[in-house]
Amino acid sequence: MSMHLKNKLGLDWANEKYIRNLYQELGIKGMKPVFKTTRAGKAPYGKFPYLLRNKFIRFSNQVMATDITYIKTPWGMMYFTAVIDLYSRKILSWRLSDSMKTDFCLECVKDAFEEYGVPAIFNTDCGSQYTSAAFVELLQSYNVEISMDGIGRCKDNIFVERTWRTLKYEWIFLRDYSSAEELRKSLGEFVKFFNSERIHQGLDYKTPDEVYEASLITNRLKTKPMAA
C-alpha cells in the first residue's frame, strides 16, 4: 500500500508506519487467505508430475497456470477461472460460469493461447476439470508439457492463489452485486486494474503489464538477427 501511494499518487510521506497507524485508526485488520483443498477427479490419463519445483522461470509465456475460485453471490455460487503468466503474474484470459463444468476452463485456455501464444509448461491442480480427457487432450494437441500440483499443496500454485486473494480481499468483498452481468463487468475491471495498475512487491514494485511487455521486448532483441 505504501509503495502504491508513493509510486502512483506521489505521496512520498505515506510510509509503512503511517499506513499501520491509519489501519489501526480505521479498525482495519489484515485478512488471512483460506486455501481450499483440491480433491482429485477421475483421471483417464492419470496425474501428471509437478514440473515447477526448483524451476527458474526466465521470461513471459514460458509457464502459464490456471485454477478456479468460488464467488458467493446473492443468487448462488459463481465460478471464476483465469490463465496467468507465472513470470509476470499477468492475467491472460478469464471466464465466469455458474457451473463447474469443464467447458469454461477449456475456453479460457483457448483464449489465452490464441492471443498470447503457447507456453512450454502449463500448470494446474488435479481437480476433475484439469484431469479430464478433454482438458488433457487440449493441452497435448498444442504439445504443451503438463504440470500438476500435489493434492492439498496450494503452495505449488502459489501465484494463482495470491491472485485469488487479491481478487477477493481487494475487490469482490468490497462491492455488492445484484446480477451475474454486473459481476462479469466488475471482473473485467478488476483484470484491467490488476494487470495495468496494481504494483507487486515480488515484481520490484512494477505492474504485471510492465513486466510482461519488458520481457517480450528483451526476447525480441535476443532473437533479432544480426545485420550482415
Question: Over which residues does each language-model region extend?
Answer:
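Mobile genetic element proteins and their domesticated derivatives, centered on retroelements
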Residues: M1, I19, L52, D67, ...
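Basic, flexible linker segments flanking DNA-binding modules
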Residues: M1-S60, T207-L216
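C-terminal domain-tail junction helix/linker
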Residues: Q140-V144, T166-A228
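Active-site beta-loop-alpha junctions of metal-dependent nucleic acid enzymes
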Residues: K72, G76, W94-Y116, T131
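RNase H-like two-metal-ion nuclease catalytic core shared by retroviral integrases
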Residues: R39-A43, T124-C126, S132-V136, I146-K168, ...
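An active-site-proximal beta-strand-loop segment
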Residues: I57-L92, D98-M100
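Hydrophobic (often cysteine-bearing) scaffold residues that line and stabilize catalytic clefts
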Residues: N15, F48, N61, F80, ...
